[in-house]
């Protein structure tokens, strides 16, 4: 069994979700993976509003999985959005063209070898709030949401070092 990260569940605000997908220029040709998908909001938005080919959430928490599956059904994207139950360190993400995450800097650090090994050149990696140390972001944006300022980092595999 590999490392099981403890990342507190904090939902990404809807405005930030949209900007994360926009900064990655998500389109109908993309396969989006959200690592630690929580209630499924990123994959649902990717499927519903960006019409992606496929959106996959990876989640380990049973309560969050139930919530995400209910939200997928409620939003009518059952055919294009799905949940994989598991530890994102162990789930194969090699088909992804976009990976989104709202984890912690130390977890991002531990994920670097997996991302570099499994993702193809050109795959976009979007991190909400926490950078991936040692990688050069292609773009960094600030997103205001109420009285909170959020930072979104875009990395592109093959251009990240």
Curated annotation (Swiss-Prot):
Residues spanned by motif DxGxGxG SAM-binding motif: 34-40
Temperature characteristics of this protein: Optimum temperature is about 60 degrees Celsius. Is active over a wide temperature range, from 25 to 90 degrees Celsius. Has half-lives of about 30 and 10 minutes at 80 and 90 degrees Celsius, respectively.
EC number: 2.1.1.-
Induction text: Seems to be expressed at similar protein levels when grown at 75 or 85 degrees Celsius, or in the exponential or the stationary phase.
InterPro entries named among the record's database cross-references: FAM173A/B, Lysine_N-MTase, Methyltranfer_dom, SAM-dependent_MTases_sf
Reactions catalysed according to its record: L-lysyl-[protein] + S-adenosyl-L-methionine = N(6)-methyl-L-lysyl-[protein] + S-adenosyl-L-homocysteine + H(+)
Family classification: Belongs to the class I-like SAM-binding methyltransferase superfamily.
Subunit structure: Monomer.
Role played: Catalyzes the methylation of lysine residues in target proteins, using S-adenosyl-L-methionine (SAM) as the methyl donor. Exhibits broad substrate specificity, being able to methylate the crenarchaeal chromatin protein Cren7 primarily at 'Lys-11', 'Lys-16' and 'Lys-31', as well as a number of recombinant Sulfolobus proteins in vitro. Methylates lysine residues in a rather sequence-independent manner.
Name the record gives this protein: Protein-lysine N-methyltransferase
């Amino acid at each position: 069994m590999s490392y099981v990260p403890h990342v507190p569940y904090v939902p990404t605000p809807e405005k930030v979700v949209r900007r994360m997908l926009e900064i990655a220029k998500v389109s109908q040709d993309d396969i989006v993976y959200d690592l630690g998908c929580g209630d499924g909001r990123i994959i649902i938005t990717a499927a519903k509003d960006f019409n992606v080919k496929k959106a996959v959430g990876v989640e380990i928490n049973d309560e969050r999985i139930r919530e995400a599956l209910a939200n997928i059904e409620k939003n009518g994207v059952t055919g294009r959005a799905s949940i994989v139950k598991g530890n994102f360190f162990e789930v194969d993400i090699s088909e992804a063209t976009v990976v989104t995450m709202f984890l912690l800097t130390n977890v991002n650090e531990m994920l670097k070898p997996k991302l570099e090994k499994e993702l193809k050149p050109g795959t976009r990696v979007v991190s909400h709030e926490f950078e991936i140390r040692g990688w050069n972001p292609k773009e960094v944006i600030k997103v205001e949401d109420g009285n909170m300022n959020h930072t979104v980092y875009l990395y592109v595999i093959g251009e990240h070092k």
